Amino acid sequence: MRWKSSFVQGLVLVSIVVLGTAAVHAQSEAVLRGQLLAPDGSAVADQDITLTSVSTGTAVRTKSDSEGHFAFQRVDPGEYTLSAAAEGFATEVRLVVEPREVRAVTLVLQLRLNETVVAQGRVLPLPSTHSPSSTTLTVDAVEGLSVAQRTSLPDAIVTSAPGMIRGHDDFVHIRGEEVALNPMINGVAFWENAHAVFSSGVSPDVIEVANVMTGGFPAEYGNRFGGVVDIVTKSGLRMNHSGGLTINAGEAGRRSVLGEFGGHRPRFGYYAFGSVFESDRFLSPPDPDAIHDHGSGGHGFVQIDGDLGSAGSLRAIVMGDGSTFDVPKTPRDVELRPLADASEQTRQQTAIVGWNRASPNQTVGASFYQRWSRVQLSPATGPLTAIAAMERQLVTLGGKADITRLAGAHSIKIGIDAVRLRPDETIAYDYAGFRELSELLGVPHLHITDDTIDFDGRESGGQVSGYVQDDVRVGNRLTADVGIRLDRYDLVITSTHVSPRVNVALDVGAGAVVHASYNNFFVPPPVEGVLSSAAGLTERIEEIGEALPPVQPTTEHQFETGASAPAGPLRVGLTAYFRASDNPVHTTVWPDARIYSYASFDRARAYGLEARADLSTLARYGVTGYFNYALGRVYFYNPVSGGFVTEAEHLEPGRFLAPMDQTHTLTGGFSYHHARSGLFGGTSVEYGSGTPTEREESAATSVAEPDQMGGDRVPGHFTANISAGIDLMRAGNRRPRLSLRLDIENFTNNLYLVAQESEFTPGQYSIPRLVSFTARVNLQPR
């Protein structure tokens, strides 16, 4: 079988690298460069500059050259202090380094008085232009979530950044882009969608740090927009033969077991993670009561890091993920068609090998990656139901390489990425039973020729991309990130596009920063259903009666401007954006079946305003907090330009509010950890004003209850989660040997309708109040 061949290829690739590795340092994650200046602006040569991790206290040093320039390679993402001292002068700043960032800093020495630095630990006022609209998600933030929220990446980050909206089928929409959540694993982007109905995803528990980018970002991030989650995974190089075992149990049959362990030798690092989970409310059900909604799955992850001395460093990763879950039903389904029990299975295997070599002014890196994934829908049976079977497989093989050169005020990065994709799809759909049910209930339904749609196809293709970008510092106050990207896509259709990107940031004084950006994006058709969505299957729908062309690539112009500034212990920011998209895509759910296809529309327009506040300066006192607010509007414009739809009105010109349009979205959180007693607690809140619905009463694809619908939008919602716990069996600065925690999700038991998109898709309901208990046993270093 194809997947077995690809699996063997991945294991052989990783085995060769692991056997040839004799290691110590991880692959380079970021570069920090800068210049040391005297108070009069002259360069300070041959002086020590120290970079110290705030979280670990680890310090590394380098010296400035004859022009005062310095550089730190292989910088792990996180918060640091950067300091220097010379002949009665000193300076120190604090800054946050993002994954794969090239950060430019100017250090200006200040007079030292009584051996005390005048400016101590201030937050660096000038952020990089790497991703101005981004949120850094640390391992502490991930572990602060309940275990149930860490089952999937979308659930873990949906409240982390402004502009993220919950949608139908547990999707996360970002700034008006549907299911635009694109994880990158150590610099490698795969094509599968991270949501549970599309793929097995990646476990949030392997995240060391992630940069959640919702606006503009450099050209290296490629054919993506909406939301890029740039993940740096955990490494044994940051662990001293330590780990832990976590056991979680709670209401709705939610149970999980997670374990991890990692460590390092003088020239070698290792890390392993594994988890299994199950739930009786796996997907958001079409009824307040979850019926036929059991799901189970697991994740496995192994990472080997090593150093080849002067030849560079290596990283090898193997991942295995899978889930099996039911398709939820309603009480009316149980009454009228008790045998209609569909289920879905996802499986995924991934291998990544990365190499990196750094010198004082240059970094070279390369990655090779492979993945096999499968999604299989097992059909419901019995009368009055659509009989829908579907299987999709995707084989991915690719490689990428880049070189970063530091030259004065410039950091120039050049890269190339080539990927080969081999999708395989089979669909067997019999609509007759559901048509009979619709006629029995007197609800709208389609007319499909012979009541059947069948498809069987496989294809090979891929994409080759190249980019150039320059992160340049213009004086002491202005930075710019300027880049251009070329993409050549060839799978079902062929398209070439050039994407320019410009991001600038200006320090206006007193710690305040103004930023602005223009980004042009090119995004190929989604890989899920890429073949069947291009097969002209709409000709079998009598209301449409014609074969639509394939889904078209999306192109977009995005404009953004904003500002941020300190306000007491807070860092506050405000951002405005406007997006103009051609051929935006949207999912189509087949009637009475969890088969997802895509359609591209004529164009879309989205605009909004986002506000955020972070309480990070009090972290050393055990206090953290954040607040996000988004005001947005999203319009889609007919007619459909390609793909598969079931509603004929989308073939006529017109404008409509997109299903992911939510006027007001608010999220926030606060936590406190008392170091002396070990007690900790926190709360998080979420508000949404409601997304549009295209109908005012039930039309029952899963036979939803009519009294739960109504209005042009689903009702707004406000929910709150609370948690409390204690760390026990502590010794000095070591992690506690035992941690106990209680979580209450949806504390007020506000069971709300998340989304109701159209007459052919069921609504989905949130979780009720659910209580869970977690115990974690930490393995102490030897």
Label each residue range with its predicted role:
Residues 249-278, 288-325, 343-363, 406-408, ...:
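Transmembrane beta-barrel wall of Gram-negative outer-membrane proteins
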Residues 473-477, 576-580, 597-697:
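Gram-negative outer-membrane beta-barrel transporters
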Residues 686-700, 719, 726-782:
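C-terminal beta-signal and adjacent terminal beta-strands/loops
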Residues 324, 329-332, 376, 429, ...:
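Surface-exposed extracellular loop regions of Gram-negative outer-membrane beta-barrel proteins
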Residues 23-132, 148, 191, 205:
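Periplasm-facing N-terminal accessory domains of Gram-negative outer-membrane beta-barrel systems
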Residues 58, 301, 396-402, 454-455, ...:
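Outer membrane beta-barrel strand-and-loop segments of large Gram-negative receptors
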Residues 89-105, 116-218, 223, 228, ...:
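Periplasmic N-terminal accessory/gating domains of Gram-negative outer-membrane beta-barrel systems
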Residues 307-323, 345-492:
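Face-selective signature of the C-terminal outer-membrane beta-barrel domain
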